[in-house]
């Protein structure tokens, strides 16, 4: 009687999938950075043509500060499709009316090119986006291919082997974008980068080049962000907004030893000791979804919707930066 090969076949496919994933992770940074390096680290930056909505993306060279919002890992292009993110952007625009608020930088692309604009892969990403927007569990799970792809870019930004090249490209995208809205690199105004979730690593990586190469005064607001401390020391100040029930943030912090406060010589500990980091307790807020920072329905003990409390906490910091940077000029 012939023996069954089912266990052997299953093991073959399992190990084959593991090997394919490993090889994919190994060569993806090369595929991502290869064209950029071949072009001499100068590549055509994709410029989005997203019209202003009367609150966000309003060119104003007379603005006293520029605020750049970098979205979480679920985005496929510079235009956010999240109602929660749109909600906090509009609230920040109202609370910081004298600042120029921008949101149309795709943080997970070295040349700002949206996933849906790739000539060969755009059909796949459009399909993944459609699946993600569906409410069925198995469809939305397939849509998380977008998140996985963007997480790979976060890992590239954090990897010391590729970080210098990748983060420098992201800084070029940011400065090119700022100039479209009237930012003068010769007379730089305060640049406030507001990052959500995984975009914190992109911001931390770009800060080093924005400060060293372009001499910009950069302030970073991290909303439940995952990032390594490398490069963030070039920021003038870093604020972290963390909820007490955000377990995703605490889990990811385990994989960032440079931000642990226990090692005496850790960069994050030195920044904290120097008074250049501030942690703001957001109360019982989760990372995302119901009960998250951007939830409209959950409320604080004072009855304030979570999204309004988050926007107000960030606006207080942004307005303080604007006042503090204007005071020396008036004196």
Task: Provide a role label for each language-model segment.
Residues 234-329:
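Lipolytic serine-hydrolase domain surface
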Residues 1-65:
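Intrinsically disordered, low-complexity regulatory segments
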């Amino acid at each position: 009687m012939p023996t069954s090969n089912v266990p052997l076949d299953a093991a073959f496919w399992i190990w084959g999938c593991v090997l394919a994933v490993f090889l994919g992770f190994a060569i993806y940074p090369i595929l991502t950075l290869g064209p950029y390096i071949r072009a001499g680290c100068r590549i055509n930056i994709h410029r989005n043509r997203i019209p202003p909505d009367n609150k966000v993306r309003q060119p104003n060279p007379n603005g006293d500060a520029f605020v750049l919002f970098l979205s979480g890992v679920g985005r496929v292009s510079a235009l956010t499709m999240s109602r929660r993110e749109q909600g906090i952007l509009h609230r920040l625009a109202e609370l910081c009316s004298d600042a120029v608020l921008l949101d149309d930088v795709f943080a997970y692309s070295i040349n700002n090119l949206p996933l849906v604009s790739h000539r060969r892969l755009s059909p796949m990403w459009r399909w993944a986006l459609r699946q993600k927007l569906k409410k069925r569990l198995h469809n939305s799970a397939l849509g998380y291919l977008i998140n996985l792809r963007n997480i790979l870019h976060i890992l590239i930004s954090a990897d010391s082997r590729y970080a210098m090249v990748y983060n420098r490209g992201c800084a070029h995208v940011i400065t090119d974008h700022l100039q479209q809205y009237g930012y003068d690199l010769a007379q730089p105004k305060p640049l406030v980068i507001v990052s959500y979730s995984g975009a914190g690593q992109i911001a931390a990586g770009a800060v080093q080049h924005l400060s060293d190469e372009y001499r910009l005064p950069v302030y970073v607001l991290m909303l439940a962000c995952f990032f390594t401390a490398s490069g963030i020391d070039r920021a003038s100040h870093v604020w972290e907004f963390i909820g007490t029930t955000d377990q995703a943030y605490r889990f990811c912090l385990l994989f960032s030893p440079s931000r642990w406060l226990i090692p005496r010589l850790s960069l994050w500990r030195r920044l904290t000791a120097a008074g250049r980091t501030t942690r703001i307790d957001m109360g019982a807020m989760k990372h995302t979804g119901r009960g998250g920072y951007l939830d409209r329905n959950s409320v604080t003990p004072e009855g304030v919707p979570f999204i309004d409390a988050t926007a107000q906490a960030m606006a207080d910091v942004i307005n303080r930066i604007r006042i503090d940077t204007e005071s020396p000029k008036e004196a």
